[in-house]
Amino acid sequence: MSEAIYNGIITDTKLGVEDHGLLTFTLGVDFDEHAHCGFGGCSFGASYLEDSSGKSVRKYRNYPYTSELLMRILETVGVSTWEELKGKYVRVKTNSRFGKIIAIGHIMKEKWFNIEEFYKEKESGY
């Protein structure tokens, strides 16, 4: 598959807990006239019930690099709050015309953010 770059607009955002207890985010992006894809979907943490001596207690788990990942997305798009993302023009790099968004970029600057590369760098110690 060949990569392609398109101009797009962030049409919707989600930051919240899925029904199975995982904290996730997604940016919905319209691009190339009829294409709409989501960017993100990765888990930041989880909440779950743990039975401790016959009593259910809600436990929370944070995953590494969560705050940095969110901040890198905001920096890339050029905003300071999650709420400002909706309506912003961006560039998207996809693995095909209607495929997965693999990176999101600033509309004017040569500034990109790729989630998979971000985690690979963190895991390798760079």
Question: Which functions belong to the PLM regions below?
Answer:
Residues 1-126:
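Short beta-rich binding modules
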